[in-house]
Amino acid sequence: MRMRPPRRVRALEGVIIMTATMTDIYASRTDRSAAIIARQDPVVYGEGAYADALSAGQLDSYARDGFILLEDVFDEADVKALLEEIRRMSTDPAITALEEAITEPGSDAVRSIFRVHELSDRIAKLARDPRLIHVARQILGSEVYMHQSRANMKPGFKGKEFYWHSDFETWHVEDGMPRMRALSCSVLLTDNNACNGPLMLVPGSHTQFISCLGETPDDHYKQSLKKQEYGVPDPLSLQLLAEQGGIRPMTAKAGSVVFFDCNTMHGSNGNISPWPRANVFMVYNSMENTLGAPLYGLKPRPEHIAARRRFEALVPSEAVATAG
């Protein structure tokens, strides 16, 4: 696909601010300078009328910041059952031998397990929990399907960091996700405190797309899931975003849930505290935003990272308890 370069608006300390005037409005990892491109998509679709889960004030907060933290969504029994399931999976040889299981760099400690909603009946039920799925449907203004699910673990003393990134940048370039009409929800299964590497988000960063430097190597996912080196924003763009919006750590008790936009800049520090951290991530994508071909001739990533074999709307479960 031949692209016409975007129009340059102005330079800011080495970062080019652009308006989208090209075929791919969110071009990234091309042979050009790092750039900041204004978002061309809504944040809350259909004015939040598709479902009734969040209040008007909560929707406004999400639209402004690019995320929202909901506390005490799941009770102690729910959290205990889910955490036990994640711990079981992370020590099950039949699961840890799969490509879905990612270990820490330089260690055999499990860092992430992908496709958990298909590897576990309990997590499958969680994926369809009304407390999660109705929020996704309301924000995205449509029925939704599971683009990706994973459990992220950060063991005490040795859990590694996740560097700053926008999920959409990767999903757009490497998976062919057309537009910014997806979100992640992180279900906290342990207390996330200031010391054990909580998720950190940059408020307002979802309104600007950071076009990144560097072409994507073949099978990039094999390295990026351990330590991402391509599709990461340049330091000047990160500094600009942080100076504009600050950085907010999602410190909260187990049972809380963070919903954040697919383009919100986020990352987390390593965990050198004694307290492990464990969260389950569900990525809901709109049924009107299904994947196309990856950009720039890349081959599709595996199904457990980016679902594309079938796009089937998730039906909310009737029961809300996950402990049973």
Regions found by a protein language model. Name each.
Residues 1-2, 6-17:
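Short, Lys/Arg-enriched N-terminal segments with co-localized hydrophobic residues
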Residues 13-145, 253, 322-323:
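N-terminal auxiliary "cap/dimerization" subdomain that precedes the catalytic jelly-roll/cupin core
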Residues 19-48, 92, 96, 215-218, ...:
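Non-heme Fe(II)/2-oxoglutarate
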Residues 76, 170, 266:
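Glycine-rich nucleotide phosphate-binding loop and flanking beta-alpha elements
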Residues 106-116, 120, 131-201, 206:
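Conserved double-stranded beta-helix
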Residues 165-169, 232-244, 295-299:
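Short, surface-exposed loop/helix-turn segments at secondary-structure junctions
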Residues 172-182, 245-246, 252, 275:
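A short beta-loop-beta micro-motif enriched in histidine and acidic residues
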Residues 194-264:
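Double-stranded beta-helix
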